[in-house]
Amino acid sequence: MVRRWLKLLGLIAALVVLAAACTSGDDGETAGEGEDAPLPEASAPVAAGGTEAGGEDGAAASGGTLEAVQSRGTLICGVNDAVPGFGFTDEDGNFAGFDIDFCRVIAAAVLGDPEAVDFQPLTAEQRFTALQSGEVDVLVRNTTFTSSRDGTEGGQFTTTTFYDGQGMMVRADSEFESLEDMQDTAICVLSGTTTELNLATRFGAGDIAYEPVPFEDNETLQQAFEQERCDGWTSDKSQLAGVRSAFPDGPDALRILDETFSKEPLGPAVRQGDPQWFDAVNWAVIATIQAEEYGITSENLADFDNTDDPEIARWLGQESEEDGTVFDPGLGLEPDFNRTVVEQVGNYEEIYERNIAPLGLERDANALYTDGGQLYPPPYR
């Protein structure tokens, strides 16, 4: 009797397993091997260039930006167009500045052509929406690396290109010598920025009553400041130095107060979820720093063509003297992309001297670690 019940229970168990296997097989045919079935209402994300994911540029929003950029032949770079020294348009209408040059660095590494860039000016409030939607491939727009931008905003920041801090600019003939002197004042500030938040934190901690006067872009903010609608203008000190250098009444008409009241590490940002693109952009940036450490510039690059240093030879994409191979780190870039970056755009020092030095800003934290700064390139091997 017991054996009959055991046989019956075994038969029931077998039927249950068979039914489960059939159900699993149906799901597999619908969704593909090892994948969850797609939601029927989901629409394809929009990629850089405006096409849906799956189209010519579809990978740009769905996780294959490197391939999409190389297929398109153009890098779409989100930038600022109103900050002297960092991102602006010159007298001829051409984009120029430190951030603009790093867009060119990325294009040189990825496409072999620093001019293959479509610059897309964005306001502070537009920038992360443009990045998330795929309107731009990369954001190089004096943007601070923060936890919420890394998390909530969906950005992923590469190596920092400029270490900055927030300051306050006032008219030279004003009575203000410190932030504590600015009780009951109106402060011009860009909306949707860490600057706005830092201002509230610092003035709140100092019990300094003030009226924030927010603007969406630097142009309207500067107009308000020139019209004396604000007593002070707060932003990253590098940006204030840029504005001061090109102020209509001359730089001596303005003063930047001594206090720095925030940390502002600035650098390129890409979308989360695309590690290959992150790696490509990150190592393009690192190339400029490594070149400076090696002492390689756009002017003396040819002197290293027959270098005896195996480390530099590897970095330049030269054949190994030992086995004749060329090192490929698997970044999806040409083996000599470092050389291309330096040859066509320059090393970090050249980029800095071209754009930031004229503003009167010392290297400080933006010097190599060997000179007391924070620029420290990781090994290329």
Give residue ranges: language-model regions.
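Bacterial N-terminal signal peptides that target proteins for export
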Residues: 1-9
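Extended ligand-binding regions for polar small-molecule ligands
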Residues: 23, 42, 47-55, 59, ...
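Alpha-to-beta junction loops
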Residues: 75-76, 113-115, 133-141, 145, ...
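Bacterial lipoprotein signal-peptidase II cleavage site
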Residues: 22-35, 51
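Bilobed "Venus flytrap"/periplasmic-binding protein-like clamshell domains
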Residues: 76-85, 95-110, 144-146, 164-223, ...
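Extracytoplasmic small-molecule ligand-binding "clamshell" domains
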Residues: 50, 57-139, 333, 368, ...
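C-terminal motif of bacterial Sec signal peptides marking the signal peptidase cleavage site
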Residues: 17-21
